[in-house]
Amino acid sequence: MSKVSDLYDVTWEDMRDKMKTWREENYRNSEHVIEVGEELINEHASKLGDDIWIIYEQVMIAALDCGRDDIAMSCLQELRRQFPGSHRVKRLTGLRFEAMERYDDALQIYDRILQDDPTNTAARKRKIAIRKAQGRNAEAIRELNEYLEQFVGDQEAWHELAELYINELDYAKAAFCLEELILTNPHNHFYYQQFAEVKYTQGGLENLELSRKYFSQALKLNNHNMRALFGLYISSVHIASNPKASAKMKKDNVKYATWATSQIKKAYQLAGRTMTDTQTSLKAVEDMLETLQITQS
């Protein structure tokens, strides 16, 4: 099999730096990680210094993704030899058991880690991940809430809890979690968009108004957010057609829907769609808008 360095005319330093970039950007390209990482380990181990251990870990996790337990076990054995008793290496053992669906064995490992170090957040999160993998969402929710009582600033955990509540159709609690995220991340357009989607799903005129406002804010923060743009359109449409909405509210929301339609058209055109494709894609949108305008006239 040809070497990466020969195929792409790169040095071992280039490959090392590429592995670092992939780690830092959480780039999920497991097959490439294995290919590059194995060559670094097999051909350049003596040059890597302490970097070799993080590369072993990186290759192991990628191997689990690809179902290559032989590679994962080889990396794990090297890490165990270098770091006997390490909680981090024990957690990797737990990850391997998870990949094999040996959840009870994985839980035992995480429990032992937590006995030694009750503040080990990685082990607690893996236990929650196992509950989710087993479809035990109620337990995952309970454990996440307990976790957040101690680590209230963990944004990843708040978002995971919001997703679990959404899966359980508990939209009020999901909205609360997303509000917490917005408070700590006021410039993250995705959280505004997701909060808007939850309020839209809850329904009712008040929630629809909130939904439209938060879709609008998501667009202000990122005017390329097409999901928020469509959300602005559809929430405006539903407000304008709501019998409880005032005449002014209906008129304003027809205007918002009209603006959103024009922006969607522009986005399609900028993306290189032909006029025919654009018109076809937007036909249903425009038909609904026309119906609204007739209703308001």
Swiss-Prot record:
Organism superkingdom: Eukaryota
Presence of keyword Endoplasmic reticulum: yes
Keywords: Endoplasmic reticulum, Membrane, Repeat, TPR repeat
Coiled-coil ranges from the UniProt annotation: none
Principal location: endoplasmic reticulum
One GO CC term, this protein: extrinsic component of endoplasmic reticulum membrane
GO BP: any one term: tail-anchored membrane protein insertion into ER membrane
Compartments reported by the entry: Endoplasmic reticulum membrane
Keyword Heme: no
TPR repeat residues: 87-120, 155-188, 192-225
Membrane topology, from the record: Peripheral membrane protein
Function of the molecule: Part of the endoplasmic reticulum membrane protein complex (EMC) that enables the energy-independent insertion into endoplasmic reticulum membranes of newly synthesized membrane proteins. Preferentially accommodates proteins with transmembrane domains that are weakly hydrophobic or contain destabilizing features such as charged and aromatic residues. Involved in the cotranslational insertion of multi-pass membrane proteins in which stop-transfer membrane-anchor sequences become ER membrane spanning helices.
Family: Belongs to the EMC2 family.
Quaternary structure annotation from Swiss-Prot or TrEMBL: Component of the ER membrane protein complex (EMC).
Name of this protein: ER membrane protein complex subunit 2
Phylogenetic placement of the source organism: Eukaryota, Metazoa, Chordata, Craniata, Vertebrata
Gene field: emc2
